[in-house]
Amino acid sequence: MTRGTAPPATALLAFLLIGETLGFNGWLAVIAIAVGIVALSADALARGGLTGATAAGALTNTGIIVIYTLIDGLGARVTGSGVVYVAWMLAATAILLFPLMLAFRGARFVEELRKAWLFALGGGALALASYAIALWAMTLAPIGLVAALRETSVLFAAILGAVLFGEPFGPKRWVALVLIVGGILILRLAGS
């Protein structure tokens, strides 16, 4: 639910705060992608997975995603490079978190880092590349559109879950797939 509500909220806030416009096709694409993403969770919602507490948590998380997406998108625009912005953000995070991890986890943290340094380095490099690409795109296109496209990764997770782990991929998920892919096609074919 969070991943589906964040793109239209991001696009709306980008319009209200920085005057970014999407046009009809852009809004249609964002809404189609968002509805498709929410539809992926339809089975869980139907089983009573949405309570007042979980809805509040989901909407709070939506707010956090919207805020960091706008801040990071604008930061990338100011620096002129998604890569530079992400590199500085990751460096600042490491500088702040490394001493905290040492303080709270001590020798255990050092041992875990020693054992998994290559995995951590690879994961960090992939995270840097992935987010830098998204932020680079935000220097060229409206933040709301990039935010919507970025969230389509949940579709790949659903497909991999079905293929690799035998998770069900019934009619509701097919409708979600059509909506998400339709939204992407609207963006591409309309030149948005």
Task: Set out the residue ranges of the language-model regions.
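Hydrophobic transmembrane alpha-helices of multi-pass small-molecule transport proteins
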Residues: A11-F15, F24-A44, R173-G191
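Membrane-interface helix caps of multi-pass small-molecule transporters
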Residues: L12-L16, E20-T21, L74, V78, ...
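Membrane-interface interhelical linkers
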Residues: V35, A42-G57, A91-G123, L128, ...
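Structural motif at transmembrane-helix junctions in multi-pass transporters
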Residues: M1-T2, T21, R77-V84, I133-T152
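Glycine-/small-residue-enriched transmembrane alpha-helix faces in small-molecule transporters
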Residues: G48-V84, S192
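Specific transmembrane alpha-helical segments of multi-pass solute transporters/efflux pumps
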Residues: R3, P8-L13, G19, G63-I71, ...
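Hydrophobic residues within alpha-helical transmembrane segments
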Residues: T5, W27-I31, A56, T60, ...
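Alpha-helical transmembrane segments of compact multi-pass small-molecule transporters, enriched
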Residues: T2-L16, A92-L96, S130-I133, L149-V163, ...
